[in-house]
Amino acid sequence: MAIDRRREAAGGGPGRQPAPAEENGSLPPGDAAASAPLGGRAGPGGGAEIQPLPPLHPGGGPHPSCCSAAAAPSLLLLDYDGSVLPFLGGLGGGYQKTLVLLTWIPALFIGFSQFSDSFLLDQPNFWCRGAGKGTELAGVTTTGRGGDMGNWTSLPTTPFATAPWEAAGNRSNSSGADGGDTPPLPSPPDKGDNASNCDCRAWDYGIRAGLVQNVVSKWDLVCDNAWKVHIAKFSLLVGLIFGYLITGCIADWVGRRPVLLFSIIFILIFGLTVALSVNVTMFSTLRFFEGFCLAGIILTLYALRIELCPPGKRFMITMVASFVAMAGQFLMPGLAALCRDWQVLQALIICPFLLMLLYWSIFPESLRWLMATQQFESAKRLILHFTQKNRMNPEGDIKGVIPELEKELSRRPKKVCIVKVVGTRNLWKNIVVLCVNSLTGYGIHHCFARSMMGHEVKVPLLENFYADYYTTASIALVSCLAMCVVVRFLGRRGGLLLFMILTALASLLQLGLLNLIGKYSQHPDSGMSDSVKDKFSIAFSIVGMFASHAVGSLSVFFCAEITPTVIRCGGLGLVLASAGFGMLTAPIIELHNQKGYFLHHIIFACCTLICIICILLLPESRDQNLPENISNGEHYTRQPLLPHKKGEQPLLLTNAELKDYSGLHDAAAAGDTLPEGATANGMKAM
């Protein structure tokens, strides 16, 4: 009776509602039955667990809370990684390997498109036609610093209003003996003088990106029209952002394959039309739609690649696709030098997507998505197609996947939209944390890139366009190689935390320590000089670019793993759109002539500190089965970053540990004496 009174005081008496779900992500027993673990752990390295099924009722029948699970499909069919994928041979099947290879090949074409702005919109040296190239050195010019560097954002350009007059003057004076018609160096002009210097009817250009003509030189996007270059950069990024959000939702509703194929068709239409643009307005508008379609291709291929792989192979197969895209980045300068004209380059970038039209006949729908959305009739046909391609005997179905599938053929499909995540307890928090991480990583990358390239006058190596380009590409390559090693030993959450700490340290040291060095450098006896400050700044910038690239890439991959299959494309769309917003800060700062850059850096530095705390709230998904529905995703609970010591009891007990305590009430009602040390919550530890 004492136990009954304690139960009623705790809210368990008659007429009372059951307690809400626990804070660590577990659901009440009624909901847990419908979302039981599908295969449990797939490997020893994970920290997140999906809660097991509730036990049978002591009377022999089903537990009362299991009644809601009567309408649910067979758990064998929802256990894709534990039942369906092994039946198909895992990644060992020849057909699965072919499909993975088909997701790698387009990454090269995607790399070409992502890095094309560095060449199409590079701001060249320019001077008034007829005045001779020497006029360029007299300050009637602007020297751009390249367009988009890397798949993050565009590197800063020096607008005309802030052109380096002193450096140009030194070059002009030194070359005055050779060029007798070179006019004397004017004093740094004010705003009105810049307008008069731009009063020219025709321009000559010195393009540094391997092309004879690009978008800037074709339509004279200099001086008063220079802002249109940044709008053109906006158009592709804004198209990517909207594309990620919209195509992600559509792919969860109609499937990955239709979105992929329609995106291929329309990127061919819009991409080839870009090369036929008659003015910069048409160019920018078509680039928006090109970015929209490119987002659909990137997102669906990423999801298909994840859903094809078993737990132990997901990360490495994703990284191979990243390396293929980087190969496109490294090959772009040679492609530009081969084409010579921006229209030919644009057409050559888009034409390889013609090969992807063959995917309509050779690339199937995601079997994992068909099973998760209960489209069992289509799933059965696809399973038989897989067994035929792999030359497998369907009679080798030990677990009985095909018989269970035939029992569920009459079930109606159950599709889910990403907006359903708003009603969850843990899943929406995980997605928001990863969106903020992605936004911070991609956004602060521009701060580090601008800081490093801002020393190009003092570092001769960085004055060259190709040196800038390949330096950024090499940092990204080294970052991906480091990710492979770190994630292998520390897992997804540990690796993300390490790279975010490095990003925060590089940012804070660059903002704080360099200002301190700058103060000491004013004293001649301090031993500090501006060269020391510049070297520290370049070092911190390289470390920051290295770490922030890993943060952004790992956040996207992490989101793809912890988001359930039924809304995976929608979740990926959110985190990729956040990355796009981070990239968008670069052309915004450039459009305002670098005004607000320091505040921009401070804001992102503060975000890194917030992200370090929030990363600890994420689950660990290494070697875990992918969640198939929203209930599975809710059961990915956060665990301590370091494992428990042997014999140490965790503070928060799971449902699996609490389920055996229900017999205490029956024992007390029967008048049995409780053993010594028994309590209402179980046995007291001795």
Curated annotation (Swiss-Prot):
Membrane-spanning regions, if any?
Answer: 234-254, 258-278, 288-308, 315-335, 344-364, 467-487, 494-514, 538-558, 569-589, 598-618
Task: Spell out the protein name for this chain.
Answer: Solute carrier family 22 member 23
Give an example GO molecular function. transmembrane transporter activity
Q: Which UniProt keywords apply?
A: Glycoprotein, Ion transport, Membrane, Transmembrane, Transmembrane helix, Transport
Where do the segments described as Disordered lie?
A: 1-62, 169-193
GO cellular component labels: plasma membrane
Q: Which gene encodes it?
A: SLC22A23
The Gene Ontology biological process annotation of the record reads: monoatomic ion transport
How does the protein associate with the membrane? Multi-pass membrane protein
Pfam families membership: Sugar_tr
Q: Where in the cell is it found?
A: Membrane
Residues in the signal sequence: none
Under InterPro entries, the record lists: MFS_dom (IPR020846), MFS_sugar_transport-like (IPR005828), MFS_trans_sf (IPR036259), Sugar_transporter_CS (IPR005829)
The record lists the lineage as: Eukaryota, Metazoa, Chordata, Craniata, Vertebrata
User: Where does the record say carbohydrate is attached?
Assistant: 24, 279
